[in-house]
Amino acid sequence: MPQAHADKPLPMQKGEFVAGTWSADSGVTLDLLDPQGRHVRRLSDREKPAGVLMLVGPADGVYTVRAQGQGTYEWSVTERLPLAEQHAPAPTLDSPRLAALAQTLSQGGTTATFWEEMKRQGTPLIEPANATHDRVTFLWQGAERNVRLFGGPSTDHAQLSRLGDSDVWYVSFLVPKTARLSYRLAPDVPELPGTGMARRRAILATAQADPNNPKVYPERGIDAFQTYSVMELADAPPQPWVAPRAGVPAGSVEALELRSDILGNTRTIHLYRPAGWKPDGPDNHVLVLFDAGAYLGRVPTPTILDNMIAAGVIPPTAALLIDNPTADSRGRELPPNPDFADFLARELMPWARKQGIAVPAARTVIGGSSYGGLASSYAALRHPEVFGNVLSQSGSYWWSPPGEEDQWLTRQFVAVRTLPVRFFLGAGLFESGRGGQPGILETNRHLRDVLRAKGYLVTHREVAGGHDYLSWRGTLSDGLLELIGKNGLARQ
């Protein structure tokens, strides 16, 4: 066996990329030494007979590859790329209109005509892709450092790319023609030190409505920073109940305080009674909703109920909209909390009876979005004698108590007998998990499968939307139609 002991020079520049190959008997090691003869890194691997070299020059100088041991070896450099020649590939221009603009710019043209066109037709730029999908390109004009997308089809605050050195920033997505989404754009987001969460939240410093999109949500936002822009494609499902209708009598909304001995706090309950409400009506129904502020604002629940009742598609339905008493109480109360579920069943509903709002469980719907959807299903699990229908919008079924596997609530439904509860489970196609973890979309599908296997009546609805009140204001009426509508689950 020949003795391997040799030094060979390897000159490198700072930042230079060097690639090559090596092979060596198991008794041989190959090491890289710096210009002063100090060890930098091991190049060979005794568990493998051969491999690749991938190096970046730490500084200018002549480095050394040292071979030591018993056996044969060889190594060679196959590629070098100086730092000055290293450039990230240009982003792919999926948009035909942007590709045409890039061609114009390469010929010495400007972006002026392009921006005039975008302001005239409105953004985002929507181009047909195939029979079922459109290509949607979000645009921003004139940022200095970066632009990020807040909302939209991305769950990860997508970065916009700059078109050359122009004032056009863009990112494109292929989305179903049925999509409806809200979004904001954040130019020049601060690059903060610290944790990933702090850096992620920095987007809120500049996130604002798209200045070239006339469609906004809510329709009367306070300013650009409190307003979302709306992307609504041609085949987005209608939301026919969200706007006031001429000739439809409006119900009343009364705000009352309710003290809870179980929870030791006080909150506001907003009571909606439809026009002509009769406390002893034989077909009365009740809807219980969390996050009252959102469901009286972004989701116009009273208007939706007014319109649906007047059209005769649902029976007379009162609503209890529950406020969160403090800023941090939502995170304590809505994820499965026995005390909060008991408050709903043993304090809220008996109190509502005294207000002339009382129906059996089969005619009571409890619902909400995100944690509110999760809380609705848990309340029905713990108190099916009170809550016979669950209207869950993007329920957070990934949740689990600290130290336990995710999807805790789904396992609880596996463990108990089938209960007299019907379900409407809605989720958005753009609510998938990140980093290989199941998200809202996947965990709602899992709960659906478990409930159906247990014999529950379940309507499962997926829409081309995100974690978004713009979607939820539509699926609220969808869920009511399924659960208490004339042709819904209640009639099956």
Per-region residue spans from a language model:
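Acidic, Ser/Thr/Pro-rich low-complexity intrinsically disordered segments
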Residues: 2-50, 58-60, 67-70
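Edge beta-strands of jelly-roll/beta-sandwich modules across compartments, strongly enriched
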Residues: 69-80
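Exposed beta-strand face motif in extracellular beta-rich ectodomains
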Residues: 59-63, 179-181
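Aromatic sugar-binding surface patches on proteins
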Residues: 47-52, 165-169
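Exposed beta-strand and adjacent loop surfaces of beta-rich binding modules
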Residues: 17, 27-30, 72-74, 135, ...
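Non-catalytic cap/lid and distal C-terminal segments of serine-dependent acyl enzymes
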Residues: 90-156, 163-492
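Conserved aromatic beta-strand anchor motif in extracellular beta-sandwich/beta-rich domains
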Residues: 32-34, 77, 149-151
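Short, flexible loop/turn segments at beta-strand junctions in immunoglobulin-like
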Residues: 11, 54-58, 172-177
